[in-house]
Amino acid sequence: MVLEKRGVVKPEEGVRALLEHLGEDVTRPGVVDTPKRFVKALGELTRGLREPPPEVVFFPLEYDAEPGPVVIENISAVSLCEHHLLPILLSVSVAYIPGDGVPGLSKVIRLVKWAAARPIMQERFTEWLADLLMEKLRARAVAVEVCGVHMCSFIRGVRDEHHNMVTRAKRGDIDVKLRCRRPPLCR
């Protein structure tokens, strides 16, 4: 990992120290490997910081008519709140008007999941995702709606399990009504 390359304490040692600080007995059998598992899990949740974006495969339109919007609704993704490093469960809906060719459906979903795999502030993430999709999908227009359930306010702070945050962004001339549903685990 990056921390090890800089000669800093190994991440597992930092997690172990944090657990001890919280009062946990790090020698207990159920906890002894927790630092290693935690670092691995955090690596998975932030893979978008280290991995390149997925390549997008395009298919020819094969018709002369002007293409209308393509809508993909309720893509499930997980991110982290950049302020607390707690999970944000996301449901993302996107619409785009194809430019030169149509991207493969699975690639659009993979791109959204890759983009979410990092610490985010949802408002900024939604704007960035719209820009990213415009570029990577070679779209003429894009609309994005993100519905997020933030664990930082679900399990701590105000402890409200009924709220969700919805953010929207548009690029170009696209007339669609997106409606994300609350992420599946939170319904």
UniProtKB/Swiss-Prot annotation:
This is GTP cyclohydrolase 1. Keywords: GTP-binding, Hydrolase, Metal-binding, Nucleotide-binding, One-carbon metabolism, Zinc. Its EC number is 3.5.4.16. It is an enzyme of class 3 (hydrolase). One of its GO terms (biological process) is one-carbon metabolic process. Pathway: Cofactor biosynthesis; 7,8-dihydroneopterin triphosphate biosynthesis; 7,8-dihydroneopterin triphosphate from GTP: step 1/1. GO terms for molecular function: GTP binding; GTP cyclohydrolase I activity; zinc ion binding. GO terms for cellular component: cytoplasm. Homomer. Zn(2+) binds at residues 81, 84, 152. Belongs to the GTP cyclohydrolase I family. SUPFAM superfamilies: Tetrahydrobiopterin biosynthesis enzymes-like. It comes from the Archaea. It comes from Pyrobaculum neutrophilum (strain DSM 2338 / JCM 9278 / NBRC 100436 / V24Sta) (Thermoproteus neutrophilus).
